[in-house]
Amino acid sequence: MRVMLPNKKALEIIRKYMKIYNGKNEKDIKERLIKELKEEHVLVETEDGTYTLKAEDEEEMMHSKVGALKEAIYKFAKPSKITDLSNPRVLDLCSGMGYNAIAALHYNKNAEIDMVEICEEVLFLTLFLDIPYKEHEIIKDKVREYFLNKIGIEYKSDYDNINLYVGDARKFIIKSDKKYNVVFHDAFSPKRDPTLYTYDFLKEIYKRMEDNGVLISYSSAIPFRSALVDCGFVISEKESVGRKRGITLAYKNPNFKPNRINEVDERVIALSVIALPYRDETLSLTKDKIIEDREERREKLKEKLIKIGKYLSTKQIKKGNIPEEILKIQKEDLNSSEIIKKMRLKFFKDANIFIL
């Protein structure tokens, strides 16, 4: 669960070893780096025996305490049903230490994975972790290729089914012409950094997904799910390990009927101004600008709805204190996205009212 930035002390320590890395000194670096991270209490063993980093807020970790690998398996690999796909193409956003990619390969050795990560330090760390799946060696080899090539040492990984892009995921998606069956969306929480939760970024993801493709995220944030609906996804949810709220599954043109999200969230996404998505039309705004822009648009939307007599407080929406004709829509045999759009159309006369 990428809730925050990695701990600054951890990043400083890792950078120190990145400077002396030459490919031949991995064993020596492993011993010293892991020891130093543990001594500084920034590398933490989780309940499944795998390791994660402390986050910027030292009370938090970058993965759930139940286990970094366990989280990758039960929040991403298994819900994606990757084992049922032949030669699936996977987009692994915010790859971090590689746990999600490792789990995906473990459950489908024929997966073609595009890993995207902006933080070199967390990628570098995976070279020195002991992750109990043999597929870790594949990911390590691709990371090794990146760091050796960067310092001018020629090295070619044997694994052509893994691609690694180090940089802003927004720039990557604009240039990509691939179509994906599975997208692991493991970004920091939208409250902290909404950069990869905007309607505009998610729309680009949608365009690059195959029919029946699924995007999976640990986040169940209302603006995120609202943006997914506006992009055309059919949203669903599944119970999550280590968290009270479920993970989000978003399908493109599924040939089956996904389970619905809870009815309270359906109503809030359909009718509350807090469902207003983040926007980043140029795919280049800073996180602070994205947050500021949404706050401004939210106030304008609220004023508009009050003026036309269509403003409902989130509290009354959650309690179901809304017009009966709108409430009845939730009894219809539709998926969550269809229900949300129908409620908006009936109440606001505009299913796309939140895309300002």
UniProtKB/Swiss-Prot annotation:
Record SUPFAM superfamilies: S-adenosyl-L-methionine-dependent methyltransferases
Pfam families from the UniProt entry: Methyltransf_30
GO MF annotations, alphabetized: oxidoreductase activity, acting on the CH-NH group of donors
Superkingdom to which the source organism belongs: Archaea
Name of the protein in question: Uncharacterized protein MJ0670
